Amino acid sequence: MSINIFKKDDQANGHFNNGEILEKKPIGFPQDGGKLKPYSNLFYWAHAWAPLNDSIIGLHPHRGFEICSFVLKGEIEHYDTLLDKWITLSKGDVQVIKAGKGISHSEKLKKGSEIFQIWFDPNIQESLYIDPSYSAVSYTHLRAHETVV
């Protein structure tokens, strides 16, 4: 068994809103041109940040996937059609969207914020028949610590 290392130059780049939100995608979509493709249940993997301004990724739909977002820096705001309200997530917080039969959501990245997002395919043929759900966990409820190297 060999291990392949995919450096930043091998990863796909992405952006929203004319570059207000930037992305580096170790595993992106086929049209993104990255060298690493979806593997097993891991479908998408991206690091996104808003370097200069607050910026919104508009309301858009998902079906089937389970989407985990980790707030690495700053704050983001999340809206979805299940909650029907905006909520704020801060550094260290985690949200999980189980898209199931379908859910639409929007994210607002605040200036200087960063997120890490992973999409899983739990078994798309079954998950398309499950009701969607949303959950968020505050960093204060997670058992973790930061190590400075």
Where are these regions (language model features)?
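Histidine-centered metal-chelating micro-motifs
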Residues: I57, E75-E77, Q95-V96, G100-E107
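Glycine- and acidic-residue-biased ligand/ion/polar-headgroup-sensing regions
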Residues: F65-I76, D93
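A short beta-loop-beta micro-motif enriched in histidine and acidic residues
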Residues: L36-Y39, P51-I67, L82-K85
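Short acidic-glycine-tyrosine-enriched beta hairpin
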Residues: L83-V96
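Ligand-binding loop in jelly-roll beta-barrel domains
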Residues: A99-E126
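A contiguous pocket-lining binding segment that forms or flanks enzyme active sites
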Residues: F116-L142
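Conserved short histidine dyad/triad with adjacent acidic residue
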Residues: D10, K25-Q31, F43-H62
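Single conserved hydrophobic/aromatic residue that forms the stacking wall/gate
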Residues: H141-V149
